[in-house]
Amino acid sequence: MYLKERKEVKKMWRLKIGEGRGDNNPYLRSTNNFVGRQTWEFDPNAGTPEERAEVEEARQNFYRNRFRIRPGSDLIWRMQFLREKKFIQKIPPLKVQDGEEITYEVATAALKRAVHYLSALQSKDGHWPADNSGPLFYHPPFVMCLYITGYLSILFSAEHRKEMLRYIYYHQNEDGGWGLYVGGHSTMFCTAFNYVCMRLLGEGPDGGENNACEKSRKWILDHGGLTAIPSWGKTWLSILGVYDWSGCNPMPPEFWSFPSFLPIHPAKMLNYCRLTYMPMSYLYGKRFVGPITPLILQLREELYTQTYNEINWSKTRHLCAKEDLYYPHTLIQKLLWDSLYYTTEPLLTCWPFKKLRGNSLQVTMHHIHYEDEASQYITIGCVEKPLFMLACWIEDPNGDCFKKHLARIHDYLWLGEDGMRIHSFGSQTWDCVFAIQSLLASNLINEIGAILMKGHEFIKNSQVSNNPPGDFRKMFRHISKGGWTFSDQDHGWKVSDCTAEGLYCCLYMSTMSPEVVGEKMEPERLYDAVNILLSMQSKNGGVSAWEPAGAQSWLEMLNPVEFLSDLIIEYEYPECTASAIKALSLFQKLCPEHRKNEIEKFLSKAVKFLEDSQFPDGSWYGHWGICFIYGTWYALKGLAVAGKTYSDCLAMRKGADFLLKTQAHDGGWGESHLSCPNKKYIPLEGNRSNLVQTSWAMMGLIHSGQMERDPTPLHRAAKLLINSQLENGDFPQQELTASFMVNCMIQFAMYRSTFPLWALAEYRSKVPFPSSKF
């Protein structure tokens, strides 16, 4: 039995912060001395018997409850940090019984318990580490890439592989498949990917815990076999040699040489889409296939409903299992691909057009090298990383570029009680700015000054200090100097909301004593951040995420990804817009003369965008969280900061009414992830509540001035938070609460610790006490 085997483990993993400092590895480099870098290390000598037993108990608890609470609770590093800091929760918990009132003292006790717990989780660099995974297609490409290049057992030790298999087993659905994300319904894409991953990691065709391989293979064959896998799966399995390139729609590398006046041009694409298809087109243009090993031949036999050599590959190009299909390809798309497949591609493989293909591959590789250098070989994200790395290996298996990629693989690994996975690339800055704001809201400054100072230093150290190298606009890039990334400075890709929240924290702490929070940020660096935000506003007043929006909306019809949406071009987002309003409003108060007219115009247009993007029911669609509750919290915050009130703003009244109408019987809020793909509000099954979403709704109502009209809904929500708090001061892990590209959900493990604290802090400082009895 898998769990019994794990009881014999006598060694432990450790989370290391800032690894690489003083390292003589010539292939590992950093722009700011690896501040915020997170890597896991297996220590064969670590751990007392009690510590190992605690880890094992966490694993078994997750396994027993894996179909009830789907995401892990991210406990391994928390246990480590709490042990290292000798954390003991000294404040006893207080519960609010039915018929009792909530007093200021009860709210304060709950708040202090949460603050002390969160403070203990801060890293030595000043940020809060956390899992940022969830999609179940993140890890297999790394395994495939390292298998192809011969580095699988070199980069991933036996302990790494054991924990990766644990993650796969623990997140297998009861029907034998794997969802697009943790807890999602089974899909061909992720079931095939995880089956192949298990086999590459050493499992036999009938191996795996609880017959994992046999069950998943049956699911695949029962649903049509690998020919029904979506396009990204077709691409990766062609690279691996388990599928055939002639069963893929064309991805011509000539695209990267298109003139800029064309409506279809790389500079007009969303950066993530652009940098996914860039290396894919290189691999497609070369029709690269990895070594055909006996294992690859076995996989060809195991995963199709007909003999591999008898498959008519050209007819499989447009196939996609119904379980995976969210964004069906249009007839125009199919005609375009067919014309490329039957006319253009045959020409480009023949002389003299073959020379054009060769030149295009060189141009594509030039762009790949540029992006690698600009990101210290982290690349933009985990979907792109193995593609970029493989392209470098194909160009030169012994080259420095490939070795620099290898040195950054461990930045993507994350370990929890549910095993080891690939996560995005880290959410260090994002989690830090929210943790800092929640702590600031607590008004317990005298107790947590050292925590605030370290967090402030991390935020300042993580600001991007330069634009992308060279002629970055020619490389389809936008300015980045003064921005903040989602993770750390090395990553290099600034994001508007990360920039706005980072700027807000620095501005707020510039008003506090330097003896408490450290020296304020230099004015020029603040101005650089403001410049980033001003550059990101569109004509409609909205703010985009990574690069200025403006491409024609019809380009989205060319979306080739069957299971995601809104990923071809940049859009404006209510969340990014509201964050920018918050930061620039505070900047305007503190630096009233700097670009005064531009900022006033920006704020006016941004407020108009929020008002115009409201749904008829009063909600706002959240693009990065689940979903309407998340978007509504942001929008109400932005409107309130801009000076709008419930009495003079219809949008604010409608937003508050939406939240009041969706409050659950227990006083909380709970929204299903199905709201995201369906684009309409859907409550959690059984109308149960989620504490993170409850916190967002509470803060949204507070921004609307609900406490002045009727504080009862806020008291009811606070009662739920207070009574749900754990013994150590944390809050329990529940459903995933974040999303991206409309149809995929993702885990932000720090949300459960940050947002309930923040909501209680706002509640304690702004809602009158005592509450009525209820």
UniProtKB/Swiss-Prot annotation:
PFTB repeats lie at residues 111-156, 161-202, 209-252, 466-514, 526-568, 603-643, 652-693, 714-755. Pfam families: SQHop_cyclase_C (PF13243), SQHop_cyclase_N (PF13249). SUPFAM superfamilies: Terpenoid cyclases/Protein prenyltransferases. One of its GO terms (cellular component) is lipid droplet. Mainly expressed in bark and young petioles and, to a lower extent, in stems and young leaves. The active site is at D497 (proton donor). It catalyses: (S)-2,3-epoxysqualene = lupeol. Its EC number is 5.4.99.41. Disulfide bonds: none annotated. It comes from the Eukaryota. GO terms for molecular function: beta-amyrin synthase activity. It is an enzyme of class 5 (isomerase). Pathway: Secondary metabolite biosynthesis; terpenoid biosynthesis. GO terms for biological process: triterpenoid biosynthetic process. The keyword Aminoacyl-tRNA synthetase does not apply. Keywords: Isomerase, Repeat. PANTHER family: BETA-AMYRIN SYNTHASE-RELATED, TERPENE CYCLASE/MUTASE FAMILY MEMBER. Oxidosqualene cyclase catalyzing the conversion of 2,3-oxidosqualene (2,3-epoxysqualene) to lupeol, a pentacyclic triterpenoid with anti-inflammatory properties. Belongs to the terpene cyclase/mutase family. This is Lupeol synthase OSC3. It comes from Ailanthus altissima (Tree-of-heaven). The gene is OSC3.
